[in-house]
């Protein structure tokens, strides 16, 4: 049953291990082994008020190693001192990194763990939001983000890496990052520096319930964030980590996290956590899913989506690429500007002070740019006026009526969405910039997708709804036109509504996944009529459903929370 294309690990928290009996572990492990091929366990030495005694940990370590399961250490950087009275609040009891007592405790925990394990992962609580008097004094005139980025870089080096290596020079230290990339800089997570300090990184791919939980993450984030970390230092991100929290409403949502983690080419998957998954309904379903995903990995190579430029320490339009990723546009999130045929820039990208020069050179080379209204707004008054006559105003429009493409003066198609959408009003100079899609309200219309030329290149401006999830409420015809712009240089695009995602790979293979709760049909348009559409899992060619003047069209049926692997061949 061993997986050929990824490894599987389970994380075991300190509070559980501290009280675990070997007989109980034996029984629980038998349940897991019925369904999963576990190659590693992360054994946590410390979390909060719990630290596993050395002798107890050695016995647990020996237990798993006798089962041919590799053991690595884990640390959660939260702490509770029994006699400590604080007059300030620390979220999740994270350490105060200007408090010397806390720093010495962290050093002690790290050295204890390094004496036991050659590999250690830090769970994603290695951050600070502390605003105690000591931190306020240390911050001085710096912003909180600048202060915390500097602080956690120093703590990483001086209180994690150096102490660990002093005890065990062979120890490899992994930092696991949470799924809230937009907030890293505000809490001291600094991948730009920490990727050089730590031996490896690890990605949190938990998305759970996007609407009813604290983090409200689009499910596509399970894919995009892992790709961003892979693009920091290719090969240095060890894997993706997800859990079953808030997933009981829909087992499919749990399995989607597994799908996207594997689609993003994770080398290892970590399940959180042993005590929560033992005897869980999630485990048998996941076991079957991982076997199927392992087979899929034989047919996909490297991800090849449209680059989305998300610089280090940036925010602006949080997860906008994930919302759009849920509408059938394949993305590749990266901290580095890419000179590909098309690049997507958002308000996040505006944090690069040289972004305008990069865009101009990109366009002069005959390539395309798609920018959001948020990026346009952030760059107004900073030179973006050289590229377009479109401007963001402070006015809004509420409508569900849209028009597509211009024929002479009127539009070629008029369509209604499912509900009214609130959008910022953009203005432009007629015939200086061109309308591709507009929103109509009363006797007026407003840009949704605009087109400009600069040198040999083309720049598109996409209006972003005030509520990003309202992209899901745009008419299917509007979403299809937006896809066609993004996928101008691809051999295919889909005609469909919302909550359909596409993942593209370098070997002409792609995956279409449905996030809908009901069965749906997608029309897949192949631009090159000489190409055949293959199902590599079944080793068969699909039949053409419809033929247009320039395209072959295939009807692809998708069940809820399902996907299809397809390949184009000559």
Features from the language model and the residues they span:
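Surface-exposed amphipathic alpha-helices with a cationic face
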Residues: 1-2, 33, 58-72, 157-171, ...
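Active-site-adjacent "subsite" loops/lids of carbohydrate-active enzymes
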Residues: 5-27, 55-66, 70-116, 129-132, ...
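Hydrophobic targeting/anchoring helices
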Residues: 11, 44, 84, 90, ...
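Short, acidic/polar
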Residues: 17-35, 100-113, 183-194, 222, ...
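A short, well-structured beta->alpha microelement
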Residues: 22-30, 321-340, 347-350
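Active-site groove signature of glycoside hydrolases
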Residues: 35-47, 93, 102-146
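Glycine-rich, proline-tolerant flexible connector loops at the mouths of alpha/beta enzymes
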Residues: 44-57, 214
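A conserved amphipathic helix/loop scaffold
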Residues: 331, 335, 347-569
């Amino acid at each position: 049953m061993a997986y050929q294309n990824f490894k599987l690990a389970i994380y075991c928290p300190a509070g559980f291990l501290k009280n675990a009996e070997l007989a109980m572990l034996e029984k629980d492990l038998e349940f897991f082994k019925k369904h999963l091929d576990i190659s590693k366990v992360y054994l946590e030495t410390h979390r909060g008020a719990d630290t596993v005694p050395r002798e107890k940990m050695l016995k647990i370590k020996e237990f798993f190693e006798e089962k041919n399961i590799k053991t690595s250490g884990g640390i959660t950087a939260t702490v509770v001192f029994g006699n400590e009275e604080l007059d300030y609040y620390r979220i999740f009891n994270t350490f105060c990194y200007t408090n010397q007592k806390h720093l010495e405790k962290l050093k002690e925990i790290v050295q204890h763990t390094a004496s036991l394990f050659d590999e250690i992962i830090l769970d994603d609580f290695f951050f600070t939001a502390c605003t105690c008097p000591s931190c306020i004094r240390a911050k001085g005139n710096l912003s909180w983000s600048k202060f915390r980025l500097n602080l956690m870089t120093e703590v990483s080096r001086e209180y994690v890496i150096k102490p660990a290596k002093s005890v065990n020079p062979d120890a490899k230290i992994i930092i696991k990052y949470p799924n809230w990339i937009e907030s890293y800089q505000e809490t001291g997570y600094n991948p730009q520096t920490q990727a050089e300090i730590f031996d490896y990184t690890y990605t949190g791919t938990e998305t759970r319930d996007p609407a009813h939980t604290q983090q409200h993450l689009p499910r596509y984030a399970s894919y995009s964030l892992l790709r961003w970390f892979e693009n920091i230092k290719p090969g240095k991100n060890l894997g993706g980590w997800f859990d079953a929290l808030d997933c009981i409403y829909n087992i499919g949502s749990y399995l989607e996290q597994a799908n996207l983690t594997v689609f993003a080419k994770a080398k290892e998957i970590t399940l959180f956590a042993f005590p929560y998954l033992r005897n869980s309904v999630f485990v048998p379903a996941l076991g079957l899913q991982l076997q199927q995903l392992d087979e899929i990995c034989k047919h996909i190579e490297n991800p090849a989506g449209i680059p989305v430029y998300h610089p280090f320490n940036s925010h602006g339009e949080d997860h906008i690429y994930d919302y759009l990723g849920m509408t059938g546009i394949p993305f590749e999130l990266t901290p580095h500007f890419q000179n590909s045929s098309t690049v997507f820039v958002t308000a996040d990208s505006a944090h690069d002070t040289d972004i305008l020069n990069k865009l101009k050179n990109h366009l002069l080379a005959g390539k395309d740019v798609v920018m959001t209204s948020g990026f346009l707004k952030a760059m107004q008054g900073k030179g973006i006026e050289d590229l377009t006559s479109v401007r963001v105003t402070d006015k809004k429009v509420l409508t569900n009526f849209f028009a597509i493409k211009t024929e002479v003066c009127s539009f070629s198609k008029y369509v209604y969405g499912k509900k009214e959408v609130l959008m910022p009003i953009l203005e432009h100079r007629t015939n200086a910039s061109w309308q591709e899609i507009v929103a109509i309200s009363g006797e007026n219309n407003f840009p949704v997708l605009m087109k400009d030329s600069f040198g040999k290149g083309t720049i598109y401006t996409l209006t972003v709804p005030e509520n990003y999830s309202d992209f899901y409420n745009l008419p299917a015809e509007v979403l299809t036109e937006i896809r066609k712009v993004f996928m101008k240089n691809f051999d295919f695009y889909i005609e469909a509504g919302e909550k359909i995602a596409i993942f593209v790979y370098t070997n002409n293979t792609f995956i279409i996944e449905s996030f809908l709760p009901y069965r749906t049909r997608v029309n897949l348009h192949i631009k090159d009529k000489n190409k055949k559409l293959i199902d590599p899992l079944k080793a068969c060619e699909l039949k053409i459903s419809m033929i247009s003047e320039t395209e072959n069209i295939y009807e692809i049926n998708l069940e809820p929370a399902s996907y299809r692997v397809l390949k184009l061949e000559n």
